[in-house]
Amino acid sequence: MSCSNVTMLVSSKPSLPDASNLSFRSAFNPFQLPSQNSSSSCTPSRPTSIQCGLKDLKNRIDSVKNTQKITEAMKLVAAAKVRRAQEAVVNGRPFSETLVEVLYSINEQLQTDDIESPLTKLRPVKKVALVVCTGDRGLCGGFNNAILKKAEARIAELKELGLEYTVVSVGRKGNSYFNRRPYIPVDRFLEGGSLPTAKEAQTIADDVFSLFVSEEVDKVELLYTKFVSLVKSNPIIHTLLPLSPKGEICDINGNCVDAAEDELFRLTTKEGKLTVERDVIRSKTVDFSPILQFEQDPVQILDALLPLYLNSQILRPLQESLASELAARMSAMSSAFDNASELKTDLTRVYNRATQAKITGEILEIVAGDIECIIW
């Protein structure tokens, strides 16, 4: 005797098996298991209907087991890589931040002496270059989606300001995203490596340097995912060029074109009510000792440090993005592993109940046949 189809209800947290969960009616015998409505049994919150044969059910269990092994392996690999990526981020931040402070101080001295450098010259903004850093692989939750949404939001802001824009895409996911949207102008597509290197950062730096110096663009912004912790990361917009410690980069009409993320929101009171004001963030500068003197001219020092500045300011976001991607992948694979374990438990329970119902039905048919023989 075979049971072709078995229909069971499985919730996210199924209750203990009882007689009310089994219902079987043979096609040849009107006998049916009695149904008992127990008030103590938990009502499934969102039941999911599983309707398939025992063989298909067994295949689904095997498939879930294979998926569980894959997600566990990917979680372990991401956990092993994220530690090294996190160390690279933590070790690289002090150098990058100190270099920016020194450059800002030298730049202020140059502005005092009315000396201009190509990368520090402020000019009315007509066109903005957006360097968007994404990942090369998927299966990392909403990591790539978050930074691409940030890029779309920034593009919408630039359109409202009446400014032109171009995109420098870094990462395969970003390349695929912008390739499917031909209406977004892209200057260059770049693929990231497994580990960010100074050579890869130099390639991006050379591209944005040529765009800015040739005045094809008047401002370069870097969009990346800042690594905060293993469970948190934030999409960030960072102004890369021109090098301005005060911000306030304006267009030809004098309107500020800085992104909202470049400003600090302060909660204050106005007329007895809470209100939000925006205060421009001013980067910290290093106060050099009066005894400290430069052997070379400050312009020469700035020209020598600016390539190092560009390289470090691009390498650090690449490292931050990689650490955020690995942390997101580890979290996503951990959730997928837990979901696969729960689904395997539910499917196994359904399979066991279906097998039990099949055996019980066959026993009932045998008993019914014996009773029919006795009656005759």
Swiss-Prot record:
Species the sequence originates in: Pisum sativum (Garden pea)
Keyword flag Phosphoprotein: no
Disulphides: 250-256
Gene3D superfamilies: 3.40.1380.10, ATP synthase, gamma subunit, helix hairpin domain (1.10.287.80)
Transit peptide range per the UniProt entry: 1-52
One term under GO cellular component: chloroplast thylakoid membrane
Compartments in which it is found: Plastid, Chloroplast thylakoid membrane
Membrane topology: Peripheral membrane protein
UniProt keywords, alphabetically: ATP synthesis, CF(1), Chloroplast, Disulfide bond, Hydrogen ion transport, Ion transport, Membrane, Plastid, Thylakoid, Transit peptide, Transport
Main function: Produces ATP from ADP in the presence of a proton gradient across the membrane. The gamma chain is believed to be important in regulating ATPase activity and the flow of protons through the CF(0) complex.
Assembly, per entry: F-type ATPases have 2 components, CF(1) - the catalytic core - and CF(0) - the membrane proton channel. CF(1) has five subunits: alpha(3), beta(3), gamma(1), delta(1), epsilon(1). CF(0) has four main subunits: a, b, b' and c.
Catalytic residue list: 133
Protein name: ATP synthase gamma chain, chloroplastic
NCBIfam families per UniProt: ATPsyn_F1gamma, PRK05621.1-2
Similarity comment: Belongs to the ATPase gamma chain family.
